[in-house]
C-alpha cells in the first residue's frame, strides 16, 4: 500500500491511496480540504514555534518516561503472559491506562514527520514490541482483561463487552489505538502498529453490532467513531465506516440510557450538550465524520443544533466547556461557575475537533472564531509553557487550590496534549476548489495544492501580540485563485457567535488589507472571509492589519456567576489578574472602574519556565508576553462593619500564563458593579491561627477564608481533602497567637458523592490544649453532626486555650474533606 501523509493530526479526512480516494469522493467527504500539517512549517522562536518545540523536547519524552515509571508498559508485559496471580485492579488502577502509550506514540509520530529522529523511531518500535505480544490470537487487545482473564479489572466485566457501556473502555482503547496506529504508519511507512490496530478493529467488527450473536453495545466513552472513520479512509475498507455509523445509530437504543454518556436519547434527537464533556465532543466530531463520509445530512442538522446550544449557553469566555466536576460534565444552560469550572483540557481539545469539522462542512468563519478562542486560552492553559506541567481542569478563578501537575493517575490530558500540539500546523489553511482559506495567523511556510497545482505561502507575524500579518506568495503554479482571509469575531465586535458574551466598552475596531501596498477591491462575504480573487505572482505580499487593543466583555445576564463583572481581552487573548503581579492587596476584593483605561506593557518569560528544562529556556530567551495595567479600587470592611476603598494599580496577564509562579489568587471575571464585589473582611480567629495538618492537603488556606457553600450541592468554593487516603484518622490544629476563650465550632464538610472519592467522616471530635500542653476533648459537647455542605455546629462548655484540634475518622472506602472550620 502506498505511503501517504495525514491531512491533519485529528481530521477525519486524509490524503489516501488512490482506491481510498475514490471511496471518499463517492461517499461525500468534507467539501473543504484541510492542508496537511506536514505541509506547514511553523517558524522557530515564535509563539507557536515555541510551543511545538517544547512538546517535542519536553512533553512527549516526559509522557514516555511516565509510561515506563507508572507501569503502563508492564500491563502489556503481564498480558503477554497471563496469570491468575495478578490482582489487576491493584496493578492497573484504570481500565483505559493502555491509551497513554497509544496517544503518546501518536504525538511522537506527528513529530517524526516534521523532525525525523532515528532514536525516537527506534524507541517507538521498542514500545510496539511490548504491545504486540499482549494481543490475543483473534485480535482482542485489552490488558485490563487479558492479564488475568478469570479475574479481570473490576471495570472490565465477566466477559468481553459486558461493561462497555459502563466503565470497561474496551472501545475507547480501540479508538486511541487506531488513531495512534494510523499516525505511526503515515509517519514511518511501517505497518507494525497499523496491523495490530486492524486486527483489534476486525475483532470489534465481528463481535460488536446489531446482528444475532453480536454484542449490541455502543462505546461508553466515545472516540471509536472518529477513529474507525480514519481507519476507513486509510484502508478503503467500508466495514469500519459502517461500524462507526452503527455506534451512532444505536446510541440511545441499547440497554443503558443516561445523559452522562449521551445515550439518553438517539443522537439525531439530541439538541443540547449534556453529560461528560469529553465524551460529548468526541461523539459530535464522530457524527461530523460519518455525515461527511456517508452524506447523511440528519447528523449535520443534529450537530448544528448542539453547537448552537454550546456557543449560546454553555461556552466559557476562555473557550472551555464543562461546568462541573460532577461527572466532568456540561452544566445546565447558562450554568458557568468560575472557581469550580471544570473546563477539562481534553474537553478543550474536543471543542477544537468539533469546530474544525463544522468549518470543513460549512465553510463559515464563526467556527474558527470559537476554535481560536479555545486554542489561545482554555486549551494551552492546560500545559505549562515549559511543557512539564499539566492542568486537568482549567478554572477561571482560584484561591491557590489549583496547580499544574507533572502527571495524573488518570493521565488523559497530558497524553492528549502530546498528540494535539504537534498537529497544530494542520489547522492553519484549507482549500476548496480555487480558494485558499487562511484561518489562523502564525509565522509559517507552507506548500499546498490549488486545483492540483502547487502554491507556496508564508506568514510573518507577531500575532497574538499584535494584529499585523504579512502573507507572501512564495510560488504559484495555480494562476488565479481566491485568498480567503478570516476576519476574527473579536475584530468585528462579536466575542462569540451568539449573545452569550458581548463587548461592553463601545469601541469599534477596524482592519486594513493591502496587496503590494495597494488597497484592493474586495469585501467580507457572508461566510466571514475577506476574499481577494486575482492571478497571484511570486513575491506578492498581502498585508493585514487588525486593530488590537484591550476590550471589556460582559456575559449574558442569565449567567449568574458573571453578573456585574467584566472580563478583559486583547485580540484572541483573555486576561486575568494573578497574585504575583499585584502584591500588597487582595485581587479578590477589587472593583473595576465604570470606564477602565488600560496601558499595555511587556513581561519577560523569566520565572515562567522551570530552570530544570534548560533545553526550553533558550526558546523563550529575549521573548515577552503582553500585559495590561489599569486603575481599580479595593474594598474592605473594618471591625465595625464600615466599608472603605483604596486606589490600586492592577496588572493583568494572559490567562494561559497563570499558575506558573506558585499558588495564589487568580481571577478572570472582575467585579464592575458594587453588588458583585467581595470586600475583604477582618481576620477571624481561625484566620489568625497557625494551621497544621496531619498529612499534606491541597488549598490549606481554604478552611479559614470565610467562604462557605450555599447549599449541600455547592462545590464552587475551595476546600481541603485527604484523598486518596482512606480509613485513617486525620487532624487539623489551630494555634492562636495568645490564649482565647472558645465555646463553639462550625465545620462545613465536603462530600462529592455519588461520583467522587470524598464523604463526610464516620465521626469527629474537638480537643483543646491545656496549660500543660496536653490534648483534652472539649467538655460538654452537645453533638458532632456529619452532614455535607451545611453548617455542622458543636457547642461546648467554654475553655481557654492556645490551641484547638479537629480529629476525624475517615470512612473505610472514602476520603474526607472540608470547606471551612471556624471557632468562636
Regions picked out by a protein language model, each given a short descriptive name:
Residues 1-22:
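Bacterial Sec-dependent N-terminal signal peptides
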Residues 679-713:
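Predominantly extracellular/luminal regions of secreted and cell-surface proteins
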Residues 22-118, 122, 152-187, 222-239, ...:
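Aromatic (Trp/Tyr) and acidic
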Residues 172, 496-505, 510-515, 755-772:
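Short, surface-exposed beta-strand/strand-loop-strand elements in extracellular ectodomains
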Residues 244, 303, 369-377, 382-472, ...:
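C-terminal beta-rich recognition modules with glycine/proline-rich loops and embedded aromatic residues
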Residues 678-681, 713-779, 784, 788-824:
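Aromatic, loop-rich ligand-recognition surfaces of beta-strand-rich domains
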Residues 147-168, 194, 199-215:
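Asp-box/WD-like beta-propeller blade repeats and closely related beta-sheet repeat scaffolds
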Amino acid at each position: 500500500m502506498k505511503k501517504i501523509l495525514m491531512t491533519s493530526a485529528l481530521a477525519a479526512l486524509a490524503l489516501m491511496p488512490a482506491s481510498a480516494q475514490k471511496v471518499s469522493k463517492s461517499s461525500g467527504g468534507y467539501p473543504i480540504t484541510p492542508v496537511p500539517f506536514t505541509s506547514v512549517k511553523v517558524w522557530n522562536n515564535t509563539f507557536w514555534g515555541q510551543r511545538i518545540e517544547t512538546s517535542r523536547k519536553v512533553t512527549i519524552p516526559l509522557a514516555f518516561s511516565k509510561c515506563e515509571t507508572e507501569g503502563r508498559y508492564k500491563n502489556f508485559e503481564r498480558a503477554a503472559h497471563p496469570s491468575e496471580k495478578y490482582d489487576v485492579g491493584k496493578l492497573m488502577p484504570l481500565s483505559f491506562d493502555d491509551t497513554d502509550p497509544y496517544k503518546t506514540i501518536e504525538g511522537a509520530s506527528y513529530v517524526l514527520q516534521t523532525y525525523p529522529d532515528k532514536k525516537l523511531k527506534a524507541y517507538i518500535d521498542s514500545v510496539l514490541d511490548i504491545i504486540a505480544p499482549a494481543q490475543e490470537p483473534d485480535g482482542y487487545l485489552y490488558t485490563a482483561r487479558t492479564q488475568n482473564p478469570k479475574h479481570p479489572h473490576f471495570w472490565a466485566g465477566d466477559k468481553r463487552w459486558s461493561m462497555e457501556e459502563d466503565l470497561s473502555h474496551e472501545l475507547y482503547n480501540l479508538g486511541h489505538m487506531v488513531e495512534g496506529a494510523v499516525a505511526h504508519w503515515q509517519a514511518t511507512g511501517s505497518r507494525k502498529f497499523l496491523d495490530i490496530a486492524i486486527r483489534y478493529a476486525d475483532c470489534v467488527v465481528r463481535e460488536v453490532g446489531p446482528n444475532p450473536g453480536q454484542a449490541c453495545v455502543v462505546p461508553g466513552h466515545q472516540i471509536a467513531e472518529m477513529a474507525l472513520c480514519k481507519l476507513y479512509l486509510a484502508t478503503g475498507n467500508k466495514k469500519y465506516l459502517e461500524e462507526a455509523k452503527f455506534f451512532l445509530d444505536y446510541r440511545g437504543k441499547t440497554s443503558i440510557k443516561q445523559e452522562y454518556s449521551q445515550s439518553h436519547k438517539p443522537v439525531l434527537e439530541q439538541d443540547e450538550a449534556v453529560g461528560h464533556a469529553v465524551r460529548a465532543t468526541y461523539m459530535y466530531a464522530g457524527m461530523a465524520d460519518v455525515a461527511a463520509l456517508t452524506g447523511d445530512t440528519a447528523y449535520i442538522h443534529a450537530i448544528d443544533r448542539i453547537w448552537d446550544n454550546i456557543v449560546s449557553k454553555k461556552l466559557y469566555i476562555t473557550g472551555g466547556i464543562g461546568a462541573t466536576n460532577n461527572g466532568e460534565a456540561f452544566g445546565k444552560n447558562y450554568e458557568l461557575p468560575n472557581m469550580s469550572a471544570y473546563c477539562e483540557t481534553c474537553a478543550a481539545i474536543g471543542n477544537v475537533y468539533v469546530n474544525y469539522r463544522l468549518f470543513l462542512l460549512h465553510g463559515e468563519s464563526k467556527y474558527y472564531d470559537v476554535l481560536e478562542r479555545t486554542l489561545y486560552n482554555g486549551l494551552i492553559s492546560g500545559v505549562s509553557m515549559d511543557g512539564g506541567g499539566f492542568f486537568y481542569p482549567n478554572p477561571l478563578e482560584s484561591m491557590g487550590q489549583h496547580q499544574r501537575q507533572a502527571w495524573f493517575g488518570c493521565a488523559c490530558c497530558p497524553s492528549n496534549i502530546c498528540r494535539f500540539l504537534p498537529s497544530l500546523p494542520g489547522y492553519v489553511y484549507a482549500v476548496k476548489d480555487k480558494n485558499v482559506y487562511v484561518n489562523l495567523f502564525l509565522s509559517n511556510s507552507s506548500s499546498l495544492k490549488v486545483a492540483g497545482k502547487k502554491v507556496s505561502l508564508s506568514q510573518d507575524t507577531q500575532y497574538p501580540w499584535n494584529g499585523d500579518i504579512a502573507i507572501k506568495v512564495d510560488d504559484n503554479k495555480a494562476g488565479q485563485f481566491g485568498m480567503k482571509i478570516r476576519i476574527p469575531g473579536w475584530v468585528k465586535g462579536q466575542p462569540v457567535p451568539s449573545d452569550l458574551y458581548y463587548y461592553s466598552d463601545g469601541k469599534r475596531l477596524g482592519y486594513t488589507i493591502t496587496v503590494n501596498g495597494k488597497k484592493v477591491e474586495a469585501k467580507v462575504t457572508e461566510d466571514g472571509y475577506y476574499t481577494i480573487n486575482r492571478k497571484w505572482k511570486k513575491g506578492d505580499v498581502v498585508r493585514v492589519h487588525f486593530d488590537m487593543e484591550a476590550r471589556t466583555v460582559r456575559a449574558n445576564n442569565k449567567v449568574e456567576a458573571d453578573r456585574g463583572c467584566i472580563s478583559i481581552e486583547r485580540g484572541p487573548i483573555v486576561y486575568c489578574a494573578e497574585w504575583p503581579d499585584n502584591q500588597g492587596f487582595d485581587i479578590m476584593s477589587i472593583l473595576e472602574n465604570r470606564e477602565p483605561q488600560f496601558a499595555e506593557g511587556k513581561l519577560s518569560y523569566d520565572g515562567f519556565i522551570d530552570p530544570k528544562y534548560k533545553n526550553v529556556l533558550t526558546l523563550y530567551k529575549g521573548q515577552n508576553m503582553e500585559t495590561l495595567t489599569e486603575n481599580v479600587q479595593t474594598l474592605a470592611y473594618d471591625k465595625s462593619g464600615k466599608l472603605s476603598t483604596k486606589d490600586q494599580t492592577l496588572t493583568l496577564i494572559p490567562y494561559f500564563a497563570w499558575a506558573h509562579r506558585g499558588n495564589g489568587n487568580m481571577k478572570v471575571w472582575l467585579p464592575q458593579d458594587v453588588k458583585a464585589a467581595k470586600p475583604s473582611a477582618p481576620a477571624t480567629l481561625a484566620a489568625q491561627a497557625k494551621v497544621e495538618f496531619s498529612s499534606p492537603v491541597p488549598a490549606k488556606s481554604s478552611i479559614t477564608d470565610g467562604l462557605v457553600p450555599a447549599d449541600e450541592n455547592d462545590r464552587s468554593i475551595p476546600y481541603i481533602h485527604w484523598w486518596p487516603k482512606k480509613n485513617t484518622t486525620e487532624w487539623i490544629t489551630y494555634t492562636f497567637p495568645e490564649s482565647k476563650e472558645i465555646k463553639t465550632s462550625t465545620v462545613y464538610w465536603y462530600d462529592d458523592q455519588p461520583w467522587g472519592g470524598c464523604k463526610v467522616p464516620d465521626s469527629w471530635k474537638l480537643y483543646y490544649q491545656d496549660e500543660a500542653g496536653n490534648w483534652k476533648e472539649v467538655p460538654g459537647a452537645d453533638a458532632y453532626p456529619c452532614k455535607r455542605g451545611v453548617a455542622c455546629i458543636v457547642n461546648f462548655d467554654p475553655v481557654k486555650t492556645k490551641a484547638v484540634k479537629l480529629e476525624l475518622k475517615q470512612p473505610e472506602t472514602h476520603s474526607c474533606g472540608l470547606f471551612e472550620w471556624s471557632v468562636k
